[in-house]
Amino acid sequence: MEKLTDLNYTLSVITLMNSTLHTILEDPGMAYFPYIASVLIVLFTLHKASIPTMKIALKTSKCSYKVVKYCIVTIFNTLLKLAGYKEQITTKDEIEKQMDRVVKEMRRQLEMIDKLTTREIEQVELLKRIYDRLMARSTDGIDMTKEINQKNVRTLEEWESGKNPYEPKEVTAAM
């Protein structure tokens, strides 16, 4: 544990890596050297950061399997992001959460469809009742006297004097 947190040890490992890389890749025209060095530095940093973190987490956590799984998934997701991939590794818990969310949304939509279907059925039944009432009445013998308020209208023969009192009369006015 002392070596993991010792700064001199860390610096000596970085120096050793740099010298090893320089001896392996002596060609000055090597175009991929900065990329290889970056990947190795990231891997070394992940190594130095993850081991002490996992040791502490395993000692303090009640469920060590979940901690290890989460650390490994996080490390792989970081490496995938560095490599330029947009996909990520998901754990079973995350998949179950997403599935629960999808199932919940599907249930909500099914309830809405059920409500809409019920309303549509009620509207169709109402339209059918209206149609049945319209078709049940016959249009031949409808008494329109009630509709136009002409129930007490008399014909010319029914007037007492035989003349219509509402007809205009000739009136002469003095000038």
UniProtKB/Swiss-Prot annotation:
Cytoplasmic domain ranges by topology: 52-175
GO molecular function: channel activity; metal ion binding; toxin activity
Lumenal side: 1-28
Transmembrane segments: 29-51
Binding-site positions, Ca(2+): E120, Q123
Superkingdom as given in the UniProt entry: Viruses
Entries under Gene3D superfamilies matching the protein: 1.20.5.430
KW Cell membrane (keyword) present: no
Membrane topology classification: Single-pass type III membrane protein
Location in or out of the cell: Host rough endoplasmic reticulum membrane; Host membrane, Host caveola; Secreted
A cellular component annotation (GO) from this entry: host caveola
Swiss-Prot/TrEMBL GO biological process terms: monoatomic ion transmembrane transport; symbiont-mediated activation of host autophagy; viral process
Annotated glycan sites: N8, N18
Main location, first listed in the record: host cell
Keywords: Activation of host autophagy by virus, Calcium, Enterotoxin, Glycoprotein, Host endoplasmic reticulum, Host membrane, Host-virus interaction, Ion channel, Ion transport, Membrane, Metal-binding, Secreted, Signal-anchor, Toxin, Transmembrane, Transmembrane helix, Transport, Viral ion channel, Virulence
Post-translational modification, as annotated: The N-glycosyl content is primarily Man(9)GlcNAc, with a small amount of Man(8)GlcNAc.
Pfam families, per database record: Rota_NSP4 (PF01452)
Keyword Secreted applies: yes
Subunit structure: Homotetramer. Interacts with the immature particle in the viroplasm. Interacts with host CAV1, early and late in infection. Interacts with host integrin ITGA1/ITGB1 heterodimer. Interacts with host integrin ITGA2/ITGB1 heterodimer. Interaction with microtubules blocks trafficking to the Golgi apparatus.
Similarity annotation: Belongs to the rotavirus NSP4 family.
Its job: Plays an essential role in the virus replication cycle by acting as a viroporin. Creates a pore in the host endoplasmic reticulum and as a consequence releases Ca(2+) in the cytoplasm of infected cell. In turn, high levels of cytoplasmic calcium trigger membrane trafficking and transport of viral ER-associated proteins to viroplasms, sites of viral genome replication and immature particle assembly. The secreted form acts as an enterotoxin that causes phospholipase C-dependent elevation of the intracellular calcium concentration in host intestinal mucosa cells. Increased concentration of intracellular calcium disrupts the cytoskeleton and the tight junctions, raising the paracellular permeability. Potentiates chloride ion secretion through a calcium ion-dependent signaling pathway, inducing age-dependent diarrhea.
Notes concerning its domains: Binds 1 calcium ion per tetramer.
Protein name: Non-structural glycoprotein 4
Record organism: Rotavirus A (strain RVA/Human/Indonesia/69M/1980/G8P4[10])
